[in-house]
Amino acid sequence: MPELPEVETTLRGLAPHLVGQRIHGVILRRPDLRWPIAEQIEQLLPGATITDVRRRAKYLLIDTDAGGSAVLHLGMSGSLRVLPGDTPPRAHDHVDISLQNGRVLRFNDPRRFGCLLWQRDCETHELLASLGPEPLSPAFTGDYLHALARGRRAAVKTFLMDQAVVVGVGNIYAAESLHRAGISPLREAGKVSRERYRRLADAVKEILAYAIQRGGTTLRDFISPDGAPGYFEQELMVYGREGQACKHCGRELKHATIGQRATVWCAACQR
């Protein structure tokens, strides 16, 4: 599933092509995604002008002058591309939003786990209203994590992946951040010290910022809007490397399932 760096990469690739463009039309080839595509998308987008493209957590928000925004989630395997308007659709190209410059914003989603919704006020939408802070914002600190974790018995990796705690940190970047901070993913969240949470918050920020710089992580499905892969995969220290040697100490990396998610860590480097 695309995580925050992949969605941010998508945003940065799309925004220059979309902001200020008037929408000419919308084609829905298959509206029955995990969340059915909102009927307002067909009704209100044609004739509207795109005023901004933003990200909240793993959601892309396409603001318009039609009194609302399109709320888009890439799901497990979705992608967005800006293409010439006469580009033939491929399999799983479910939505086309045609623009005044003759190009088209195309949403492809093979597994149909994504969504394309309409919302007057994005911050009040049920999918967004209860989300935690952005990990790259000043609100996300080690002190914040330490205070919120008090008394929690869940594994710290599960805690870090809770979108009500902090948004956008999924399995890949939680594993990598915990490795950099030297914290075992198995440790109870409430038993991590303030100082170690400060290291963890710094690690999350550093790893996410670098992953964005590298264009995200291409594992199976993610490609950026220009079709390029993400290159952070080459930098992975633990994720997907079970049974291999730790790049820091040479010990064999361990593997377990935590919260129904595969987890890899170094028992020597992470305590």
Curated annotation (Swiss-Prot):
The GO biological-process annotations, alphabetized, read as:
base-excision repair
**Assembly:** Monomer.
Specify which residues bind DNA according to the UniProt entry for this protein. H92, R111, R152
Q: List the SMART domains hit by this protein, alphabetically.
A: Fapy_DNA_glyco, H2TH
What this protein catalyses is: Hydrolysis of DNA containing ring-opened 7-methylguanine residues, releasing 2,6-diamino-4-hydroxy-5-(N-methyl)formamidopyrimidine; 2'-deoxyribonucleotide-(2'-deoxyribose 5'-phosphate)-2'-deoxyribonucleotide-DNA = a 3'-end 2'-deoxyribonucleotide-(2,3-dehydro-2,3-deoxyribose 5'-phosphate)-DNA + a 5'-end 5'-phospho-2'-deoxyribonucleoside-DNA + H(+)
The active site annotation covers P2 (schiff-base intermediate with dna), E3 (proton donor), K58 (proton donor), R261 (proton donor)
Entries under NCBIfam families matching the protein: fpg (TIGR00577), PRK01103.1 (NF002211)
Q: How is the cofactor bound?
A: Binds 1 zinc ion per subunit.
> GO molecular function of the protein, one example?
class I DNA-(apurinic or apyrimidinic site) endonuclease activity
Protein function: Involved in base excision repair of DNA damaged by oxidation or by mutagenic agents. Acts as a DNA glycosylase that recognizes and removes damaged bases. Has a preference for oxidized purines, such as 7,8-dihydro-8-oxoguanine (8-oxoG). Has AP (apurinic/apyrimidinic) lyase activity and introduces nicks in the DNA strand. Cleaves the DNA backbone by beta-delta elimination to generate a single-strand break at the site of the removed base with both 3'- and 5'-phosphates.
Where are the zinc-finger regions (FPG-type) in this chain? 237-271
Q: List cofactor names only.
A: Zn(2+)
Cystine bridges: which residues? none
Record-listed E.C. numbers: 3.2.2.23, 4.2.99.18
List the HAMAP family. Answer: Fapy_DNA_glycosyl (MF_00103)
Extract the coiled-coil ranges from the record: none
Query: What's the name of the protein?
Result: Formamidopyrimidine-DNA glycosylase
Record's keyword annotation contains DNA damage: yes
Mind listing the UniProt keywords for this protein, alphabetically?
DNA damage, DNA repair, DNA-binding, Glycosidase, Hydrolase, Lyase, Metal-binding, Multifunctional enzyme, Zinc, Zinc-finger
| Family matches, as Pfam families | Fapy_DNA_glyco, H2TH, zf-FPG_IleRS
Task: Classify the source by domain of life.
Answer: Bacteria
PROSITE patterns named in the record: FPG_CAT (PS51068), ZF_FPG_1 (PS01242), ZF_FPG_2 (PS51066)
Q: Where is the signal peptide?
A: none
Q: Which family does it belong to?
A: Belongs to the FPG family.
